[in-house]
């Protein structure tokens, strides 16, 4: 058997991982500006953590979860999304306690797992950036969180991203709308896809989210949930819209957007762009004011989003955005002869200890091959170290671009390499 990575996974090699690290670092710095701290939860959870919170009838639970019974016969699942594990952690670690400053703001970066058909920007193991804010019902929290994602896209230079906005209202609003949707869809039940016929019985709002052609046709003239918002829900949504306007964040109202998870209420949103003439959601989230209570915690408002890293990098690539990740070395040491091996190690280590990026030859190659490596690594300077240099205690350091050289002692290299670099950069 040829050993290969499982279908729907990827190896992120050093040339690409630098781009991932750059995007992750920009995200971390953006989130810090909004007073978010990092949280890390397990990659696997008890099955009920996901099934009960995400919803037993969702595609995630019924079709896409990686779940198994471990050796202790515990029902375990690899996490398919980030919010439920974070809420579980919030409750388990009593972050709702009065001594913990509110709102509690956390972000996470990690792998998620769903058994889906692999395609561009959608893998079975995918990576997600996410944020969760606990303890604020203020619509300003909704807008601040959306603005944080908007700022991240702007910082990365991403263009042509549209904010889609909707409200699911509170429980009373959703119940009224649910019945209106059932009344509308029931006469055309037979024209719906098999999945949506099931959804009509279990969770009719999910029909609005279907990607099947026949379902899209069926819901074209469906009633709008915005017509069923009560006064509280309407006020919340109006304030969100007014604040987005005040921050000059453009948006479109998308009344058919319901999100694929059961725990949302009030504001929901997606950032959508077009790739190869197809719509691609790169960030999505919303408000969930009952989820903490559902996990056994006190009544606690919540708001957050998830953002797919693979999709974000795909958009950056398709839009031709060059990330500033070109790697280079400060110095490359070419080593001539076994007699210079030990001294080369001492030199390269001392330069690294001074805070510089350094590499040396380990393979005993010809000098031409070593110089080629220096060029490949984009080394700013090159030191050639042979047995004669070891004996004299003096080496030549060459600027790899201008070919200018300076002669320096080992002592100067090992104690003050910064000065040597400055000499060559004049």
From Swiss-Prot:
Compartment(s): Cytoplasm
Organism: Streptococcus thermophilus (strain ATCC BAA-250 / LMG 18311)
CDD domains: HisRS-like_core, HisRS_anticodon
Assigned EC number: 6.1.1.21
One of the record's GO molecular function terms: histidine-tRNA ligase activity
Chief place of localization: cytoplasm
Annotated Gene Ontology cellular component terms: cytoplasm
Family named by the database record: Belongs to the class-II aminoacyl-tRNA synthetase family.
Top-rank taxon: Bacteria
Swiss-Prot/TrEMBL GO biological process terms: histidyl-tRNA aminoacylation
PROSITE patterns given in the database record: AA_TRNA_LIGASE_II (PS50862)
Protein name in UniProt: Histidine--tRNA ligase
InterPro entries membership: aa-tRNA-synth_II, aa-tRNA-synth_II/BPL/LPL, Anticodon-bd, Anticodon-bd_dom_sf, His-tRNA-ligase, HisRS-like_core, HisRS/HisZ, HisRS_anticodon
Keyword Transferase: no
Designated gene of the protein: hisS
This protein's UniProt keywords: Aminoacyl-tRNA synthetase, ATP-binding, Cytoplasm, Ligase, Nucleotide-binding, Protein biosynthesis
Catalytically driven reaction(s): tRNA(His) + L-histidine + ATP = L-histidyl-tRNA(His) + AMP + diphosphate + H(+)
């Amino acid at each position: 058997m040829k050993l290969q990575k499982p279908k729907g996974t990827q190896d992120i090699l050093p040339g690409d991982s630098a781009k991932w690290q750059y995007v992750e670092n920009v995200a971390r710095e953006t989130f810090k500006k909004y007073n978010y701290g990092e949280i890390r939860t397990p990659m696997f959870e008890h099955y009920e953590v996901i099934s009960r919170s995400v919803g037993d009838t969702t595609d995630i639970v019924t079709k896409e979860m990686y779940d198994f019974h471990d050796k202790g016969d515990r029902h375990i699942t690899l996490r398919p999304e980030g919010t439920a594990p974070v809420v579980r952690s919030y409750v388990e670690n009593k972050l709702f306690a009065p001594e913990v400053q509110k709102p509690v703001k956390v972000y996470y970066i990690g792998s998620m797992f769903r058994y889906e058909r692999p395609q561009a920007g959608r893998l079975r193991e995918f990576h997600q950036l996410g944020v969760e804010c606990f303890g604020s019902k203020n619509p300003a929290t909704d807008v601040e969180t959306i603005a944080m994602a908007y700022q991240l896209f702007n910082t990365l230079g991403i263009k042509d991203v549209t904010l889609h906005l909707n409200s699911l209202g509170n429980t009373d609003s959703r119940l009224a709308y649910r019945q209106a949707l059932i009344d509308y869809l029931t006469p055309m039940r037979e024209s719906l896809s098999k999945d949506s016929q099931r959804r009509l019985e279990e969770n009719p709002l999910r029909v609005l989210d279907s990607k099947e052609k026949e379902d899209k046709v069926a819901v074209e003239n469906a009633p709008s949930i915005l017509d069923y918002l009560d006064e509280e829900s309407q006020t919340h949504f109006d304030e969100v819209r007014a604040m987005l306007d005040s921050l000059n964040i453009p948006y479109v109202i998308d009344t058919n957007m319901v999100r694929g998870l059961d725990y949302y209420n009030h504001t929901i949103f997606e950032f959508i762009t077009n790739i190869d003439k197809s719509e691609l959601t790169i960030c999505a989230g919303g408000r969930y004011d009952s989820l903490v209570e559902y996990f056994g915690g006190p009544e606690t408002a919540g708001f957050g989003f998830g953002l797919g890293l693979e999709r974000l990098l795909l958009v950056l690539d398709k839009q031709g955005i060059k990330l500033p990740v070109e790697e280079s070395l400060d110095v490359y040491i070419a080593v001539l002869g076994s007699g210079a091996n030990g001294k080369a190690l001492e030199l390269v280590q001392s330069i690294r200890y001074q805070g510089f990026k350094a590499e040396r030859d380990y393979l005993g190659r010809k000098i031409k091959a070593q110089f080629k490596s220096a060029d490949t690594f984009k080394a700013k300077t090159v030191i050639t170290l042979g047995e004669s240099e070891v004996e004299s205690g003096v080496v030549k350091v060459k600027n790899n671009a201008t070919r200018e050289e300076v002669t320096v002692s080992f002592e100067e290299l090992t104690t003050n390499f910064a000065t040597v670099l400055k000499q060559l950069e004049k």
